[in-house]
Amino acid sequence: MSFKYILLDKKDGIATITFHRPEALNALNSEVLADLDAVVDDVIADDEVRVVVFTGEGKSFIAGADIKEMDGDTALEAIRYSRKGSAVFRKIELMDKPTIAAVNGYAFGGGFEFVLCTDIRFACSKAKFRLPEVTLGIVPGFNGTQRLPKCIGMNKAKEILFTGKMLTAADALELGILNHVTEPEQLMDEVYAMAGQIAANSASAISLVKAAVNAGSDMDIDIGKNIELGYMAACFGTPDQIEGFASFKEKRAAKFR
């Protein structure tokens, strides 16, 4: 399967999705979103894929929405575009496979919002982050006003959203937006090292851990702990649980399906 604006590579249980529109700094237009939606469906359906990595081609991760395409849109057209992007981003956030952002450059607007949808976030030291929508007279359209406060707290999020200021990778790391910052030449090596570590673990257990964490972030702990209990119990008797326990008793590395 091939796409115009997305490159897809699968190797050793890791799918790498690369935004491939460098002439526009990988800006998100309707065609990119359509390609992204299709490629995400592909990796979700592929049982051989255990981890999904997102990165960008060239000097940009995603430079935001395509302002040229949006210029002249009516309110209804803007709503349709926002709903499409929001739906794809939510699909990525909820997919049962762990996702890693490898931010190689600019992550502005929708690019920053995309990063917030992923599970683990790496960036090179030259990466920049910005939500500039208020400088354009608009509001973030891919749920940045919702995810950023949950990530770093309301007060810090409001400062970033109200000012439209630029964040360095070091800033984003300090705020808790990023997990790791690397030198540019080391970015993908470090991303793949972690992806490989995750891929070696039980895919079924990881999918349930992710579901439990996602569910618990929006509910009382007394409800969330029952969800966790149900997921934990569901693991027992599965091939991965049997293999995991056997490997522990036999003092060897587990070989999960």
How does the language model describe each region?
Residues L33, I67, G85, F89, ...:
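A general structural signal for well-ordered alpha-helical segments in protein cores
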Residues A87-D96, A102, F108-F162, L175, ...:
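CoA-thioester-processing core
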Residues M1-E57, R90, A246:
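Conserved CoA-thioester-binding segment of acyl-CoA-metabolizing enzymes
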Residues E48, G56-K91, A107, D220:
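Glycine- (often His-adjacent) and acidic-residue-rich active-site loop
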